[in-house]
């Protein structure tokens, strides 16, 4: 049994001269039903609500302001779900809508609840359809792309494979639309390779919010958690059938043999730091090389305001980020200590090692 996450991009659901949006979804769902029938589990992360909403409203150009985008998403999301429901009903499967925002992942409790809900739906042989909650999320709560969301969901449910269906056939060394010497990249084996790949392609067309960079970010998140990622051209729907049967996508991002684990992935990728802790060389060495927690005495400066148990990033004297974690002490209390520099034989822990992830752990 394989647990699949399939991300379907906006550009694939707009329809074209050959296939309507309805036909495209029906085709994908047919392949998914085949996979489920042989015992696999599948979830879909589907874009398209804004694009379909614009289409139904007769808008020829995608709006730029957030309120218009949210209104279009509200129109399109219901229609999008009706297409999936109709397509899967033919094969005897129910579908479930799950709308998420960044805040759902920033709370450890909500993060766990979301994963448990998805797993229960899978136990019931339901097909979860996940999308960002575009209709209510403000700029601070939005991921802005479903590539990152698909990787975080895959991590939360411990998926085996993530398929990113898009409108390119594979990853290239540069944008082949503008560079005739662009070389195809069929395999990527580490996060370092992902970081080193320089893509000069346009970030998106005007109907989508994801681009090559967001797909690289998604691949980095997923592979660090032991998940194989396929980047494939969804304009040829049959490629999904082939991948679900064991073939490969145009580019395969191979999983890290030593996953960092759900907790560290949550700390590194799901949380938005509310402040920055500047540490001295002693604290840097203790954190980086000795596996220690961050004590308050090692903090020399602080940026931002945050409450107890909120996420922070930790930087060295050069301002380079070295870690992220959860602060057990508020910014107000830390500033009070810095201003007074109270001497003690036992200083409190600000970020415990159990809720800290090193930046270097993400570069392997």
UniProtKB/Swiss-Prot annotation:
What Gene Ontology cellular-component terms does the record carry? cytosol
InterPro entries to which the protein is assigned, alphabetical:
AceGlu_kinase-like_sf, Asp/Glu/Uridylate_kinase, G5K_ProB, Glu/AcGlu_kinase, Glu_5kinase, Glu_5kinase/COase_Synthase, Glutamate_5-kinase_CS, PUA
Chief subcellular location equals cytoplasm
Quickly give the catalysed reaction: L-glutamate + ATP = L-glutamyl 5-phosphate + ADP
> What's a single GO BP term from this record?
L-proline biosynthetic process
Its UniProt pathway annotation is: Amino-acid biosynthesis; L-proline biosynthesis; L-glutamate 5-semialdehyde from L-glutamate: step 1/2
Residues that bind substrate:
47, 134, 146
Its localization reads:
Cytoplasm
* Leading EC class: transferase
Q: Which GO terms describe its molecular function?
A: ATP binding; glutamate 5-kinase activity; RNA binding
So what EC number does this one have? Answer: 2.7.2.11
> Where, by residue number, does ATP bind?
7, 166-167, 209-215
Instruction: Please give the SUPFAM superfamilies that the UniProt record associates with this protein.
Output: Carbamate kinase-like (SSF53633), PUA domain-like (SSF88697)
PROSITE patterns, per this entry? GLUTAMATE_5_KINASE (PS00902), PUA (PS50890)
Q: Which UniProt keywords apply?
A: Amino-acid biosynthesis, ATP-binding, Cytoplasm, Kinase, Nucleotide-binding, Proline biosynthesis, Transferase
Residue span, PUA domain: 274-349
Which cysteines are disulphide-bonded? none
Q: What does this protein do?
A: Catalyzes the transfer of a phosphate group to glutamate to form L-glutamate 5-phosphate.
Membership in a protein family:
Belongs to the glutamate 5-kinase family.
Name of this chain's protein: Glutamate 5-kinase
Question: Which organism does this sequence originate in?
Answer: Prochlorococcus marinus (strain SARG / CCMP1375 / SS120)
Q: Which gene encodes it?
A: proB
